[in-house]
Amino acid sequence: MNLLVLALLVSCFLASYLARGLKVLPVYFVLLPELLAGVALLIVLSRLVVGKRPQLDGRYLLFIGLLVLTMAMGIVAQRVPAGAVVSGLRDYIPMLSFLLLGAAYPFTSRQIKAQLVVIGVLLLVQVPTAVYQRFFSFAHKMHTGDVVTGTTTNSGTLSVVMVSGVTVLTVLYLRRRIALMPLLVLTGFMLVPTMLNETKATFVMLPIAMLAPIFFMRRSEKPFRRLIPLVAVFAVAGVAFVGVYNAMIQHRNPDSSLQEFWFEGGVLNYVYKGSLEGDERVGRVDSVQIALREISQSPLRAVFGLGIGNVSPAQLPGFDGEYSHYYRAYKISFTQITMLLWNLGYMGIVVYGLLFYAIFRDAVLLARGAGKDAMLGQIWAPIVMIAAMCMFYKAVLTDQEFIYPFMFYAGVVGRRAHLLRQERRALKRSQAPAAERGWGPASVLARQ
């Protein structure tokens, strides 16, 4: 089973890059992650047949049920073409397969450690790849960092996964698994791609990655003793990022800087163009406003959206949605919030809000526990925070490099949190009969 997960991780990061980027594999290899998702679904179903159901809290099952219901209602209400339905399901069914796989199979700590090592290697590969793309492969496009994608789908996704890797390094330091100097060197190395592709959101993600893990440890472990060195590393990384970003941006706008973007009104102009007031440009906030305006034309649209796949173009004829011409015109792929509103309506926001709440709740439960899963929970809680923040930044839930591993480990965390709750309930039940038989402190005093 672990080989399937390792194959998934490798294929998510490399299949599309090798097939479409380098063109050293047949183009059909881009479907490998989805094929593995199908295998995962068959494994989950086979375990259900023999009575081994996924160990998950009811909130996850509610999420799956509401998601399926919302998709079905949107398809029926908007009469989505069959081809568009098939195209749309590709964004949802595979991720559910990996959520259930993580919850259904009892992966050992050793297996998860092997998986994290593979992820670490894949993240390290992104650094030389990003350097090559920026200074060699796309040297003629020095005016933009968008071409620096590593082996991932786009530059934004690359930055999200690299900053998530910094979260792992931070937790390893707080847990005394690595020393300060390796943390400093590896953090700087991991952030190189985010500097080269000029991801401004790193300025928001990095504090979460490096500072939030402190608040998900038990007080008895005295995490704040390592706060000052950690803040020092964060400051060095931040200064380095600003310096490199300002040097890179000179190729596009010599008068621009990161400080100007964040503190002198640049961020507002970046996310909001005023398209509803007549500007032809569409920013991230504009894309959400347009989605809200369009789906509010009828109650069914508002609740369930225009239906999955109905606003997305396709490479094959017959798979385009009825409103696929909206995709580029209204920048539907700008943010995940925008995509959810178009595809699933307000229910999409509610459904995924429930998912993020359930994952975060379970991660915190593990992190503040005393068991061997505490480190896993401590890693996962900040990553969930980063993912939630990125809902307003990128359409991260449709990028395989992020969403497939994210949902798999959500299942792993959910399973372990569910078992921890069962263990605690069993302990309470075992203590209750002793108190009823008169062994509790109150009954002893009463007999005296």
Model-derived features: positions:
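Loop-to-helix entry and N-terminal half of a specific, functionally important transmembrane alpha helix
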Residues: L4-F13, K331-T335, W342, G353, ...
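Interfacial loop-to-transmembrane-helix boundary motif in multi-pass membrane proteins
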Residues: L4-V5, Q55-L67, L101-P128
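Long extracytoplasmic/lumenal interhelical loops at the membrane interface
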Residues: H140, G278-L344, A363-R368
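A membrane-periplasm/extracellular boundary helix in multi-pass inner-membrane enzymes
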Residues: L196, M217-G274, S296-Q297, A446-R447
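Alpha-helical transmembrane segments of multi-pass inner-membrane proteins
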Residues: K113-H140, T152-R219
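Transmembrane alpha-helices of multi-pass inner-membrane enzymes
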Residues: V168-L169, L355, D362, I379-P441
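N-terminal signal-anchor transmembrane segment
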Residues: M1-V49, L69-A77, T129, G440
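Aromatic-anchored transmembrane helix interface
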Residues: V30-A40, G58-M71, P81-A104
